Amino acid sequence: DLIMEVIKNPGIRPAMFVPTHINRKNPKLLEQVFELAKCGGMVDATCRKDVNPDSENMSAADFAMLAKENDLLDHVTFSSDAGGSLPEWNGDHSRITGMGIGTPETLMFELRNLVQKKHLPLEEALLPLTSNPARIYGLEGRKGAIRKEADADILVLESDGLEIRDVISRGRLVVRRGEVIKKGYFE
């Protein structure tokens, strides 16, 4: 009951608390995060390519589908832990055998899972990656949607495999037909 205990604190509103790494197959945790979402809070699912069906984790796509079944998809965000450490486990998950690094590609991996395997319409599958995070971080109007006066951050996807074709960042084309044409400061 730790999640609900946090928001019982008079100084913490549900919208101020965003638990992450919540895509676990733990019924009690799922009950709590959905209760938080029903109170107006947001929850974040971690995207990974290597979720073993026998592990304690579920894919971010599976979590999003559970949220949709509970009419709570607009309370879910996805994150990648890009650049963060990801433990690599032995076969029975009893020992860490190495350390990997999270990559942003896992976000697109889970978007494809939602659209191609779970058959969620693209406009709904995009919510945890676009308008939902923009809303909780106070960026609505500038980020998360294509509209006049917004920053014009746009991914153009191939229709058949949802591969990234073009990237527009703040109105400037930075990737054309899959090739980087303008690099950022840290690339």
For each predicted feature, which ranges?
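Active-site core of metal-dependent hydrolases
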Residues: D1-W89, S94-T97
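C-terminal cap of metal-dependent C-N hydrolases
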Residues: I146-E187
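Residue-level "edge-of-site" marker
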Residues: K49, L127-P128, L162
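His/Asp/Glu-enriched, well-ordered alpha-helical/loop segment
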Residues: K68-K148, I154-V156
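Positions that flank functional sites
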Residues: V51, T130, K182
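C-terminal extensions
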Residues: L2-E5, H119-E123, R177
